[in-house]
């Protein structure tokens, strides 16, 4: 999974990236300090994996990972190449989802590119640039197929879809809120346009330390972000990038103590992972043994053979059965053999839909 972190200058974008990935990306109090996208790989926190690793005394524990890309800052006119617009638009097109950092804190020492803190305006600035870019893509498609569509029913059908999506965008709406017809062709066409405004989006409301304890409930800027996110089907999580930067230098016990002192249950990374998995419809299944315990990320609704294919294509091709037990049931019973004796280990076939927290042993023959 690849997430692109975006935002206007001086909203805390690179500070957040630095703290999440400890990659040391340059962060400064002036626009355009992020020219090329910085990439960092972050392990997905998963207590279940640690418990299983201890249970099996595994030689190796391998968590799932998320790739973060700190994308060049965007300003008004990016769709026309202003600022670092061309690089921004090219880089953002490659990610699975967008993490849009929005400034929701007041600080006279940190300049705002527009002179004041206004998350609604900031969100609209970036969203409009993405819309303009998408409209250009659709215009090019219309120009390419309009003439042929007069004599080709399939192209005529696609032209109707393209024009409908364009009208939706020109109304100031994001492509992800467009209701694509329940038709295989339409679904494929829409996906093929790879529209920026169709990408799932998570808003990271960057607040001051004082707003963390109540999750931004008393911050009017956060309320506005939540309102806008609800309208466009996006997720929101509240974070203090400055605190995350401080947490990045602490060990696990120190982090836990620091968060407790702040009255906060979860770190920003934990919140972001949860929001990402929720938005993208992802779950994790686990493989476990003495050699290795590992978490594998899949889409909800994935069937056993396709889950096996995440490990190796041979597993999917030669799939026979999947021996499945919930991780907690396995731990509670002390061993896989004991769980088998109690009848709580399932032998599942090709139609089994994998569940979050399943520990699976695949049987295959190639």
What is the predicted function of each stretch?
Residues 22, 54, 90, 128, ...:
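Short, intrinsically disordered, mixed-charge
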Residues 6, 32, 37-40, 47-49, ...:
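Short capping/connector residues at structural and topological boundaries
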Residues 1-111, 139-140:
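Conserved G1/Walker A P-loop phosphate-binding module
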Residues 2-6, 17, 146-353, 360, ...:
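C-terminal-of-GTPase-core extension/linker across diverse P-loop GTPases
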Residues 40-45, 72-82, 93-155, 168-182, ...:
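Conserved Switch II/interswitch segment of TRAFAC-class P-loop GTPases
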Residues 32, 46-49, 62-68, 82-95, ...:
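Amphipathic alpha-helical transducer elements in NTP-driven molecular machines
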Residues 23-31, 38-40, 48-51, 80, ...:
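Glycine-rich, flexible loop/turn motifs
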Residues 92, 354-355:
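Short, well-ordered loop/turn sites that connect or cap secondary structure elements
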């Amino acid at each position: 999974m690849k997430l692109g972190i975006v935002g206007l200058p001086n909203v805390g974008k690179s500070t957040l990236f630095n703290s999440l990935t400890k990659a040391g990306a340059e962060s400064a109090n002036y626009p355009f300090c992020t020219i090329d996208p910085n990439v960092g790989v972050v392990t997905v926190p998963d207590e279940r994996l640690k418990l299983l690793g201890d249970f099996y005394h595994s030689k190796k524990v391998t968590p799932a990972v998320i790739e973060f890309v700190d994308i060049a800052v965007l300003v008004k006119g990016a769709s026309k190449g202003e600022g670092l617009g061309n690089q921004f638009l090219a880089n953002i097109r490659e990610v699975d989802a967008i993490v849009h950092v929005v400034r929701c804190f007041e600080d006279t020492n940190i300049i705002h590119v527009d002179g004041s803190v206004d998350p609604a305006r900031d969100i609209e600035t970036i969203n409009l640039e993405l819309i303009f870019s998408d409209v250009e893509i659709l215009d090019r498609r219309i120009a390419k197929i309009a003439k042929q569509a007069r004599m080709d029913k399939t192209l005529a059908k696609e032209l109707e879809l393209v024009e409908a999506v364009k009208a939706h965008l020109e109304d100031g709406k994001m492509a992800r809120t467009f209701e694509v017809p329940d038709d295989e062709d339409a679904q494929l066409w829409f996906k093929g346009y790879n529209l920026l405004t169709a990408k799932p989006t998570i808003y990271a409301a960057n607040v001051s330390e004082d707003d963390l304890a109540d999750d931004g409930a008393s911050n009017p800027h956060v309320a506005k972000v939540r309102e806008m996110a609800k309208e466009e089907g996006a997720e929101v999580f509240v974070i203090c990038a400055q605190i995350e930067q401080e947490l990045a230098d602490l060990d696990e016990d120190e982090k836990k103590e620091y968060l407790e002192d702040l009255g906060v249950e979860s770190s920003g990374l934990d919140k972001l992972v949860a929001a990402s998995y929720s938005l993208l419809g992802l779950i994790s299944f686990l493989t476990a043994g003495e050699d290795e315990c590992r978490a594998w990320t899949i889409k909800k609704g994935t069937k056993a053979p396709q889950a096996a294919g995440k490990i190796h294509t041979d597993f999917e091709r030669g799939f026979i059965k999947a021996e499945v037990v919930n991780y907690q049931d396995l731990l509670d019973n002390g061993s896989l053999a004991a769980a088998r004796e109690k009848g709580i280990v399932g032998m599942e076939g090709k139609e089994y839909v994998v569940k979050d927290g399943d520990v699976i042993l695949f049987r295959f023959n190639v």
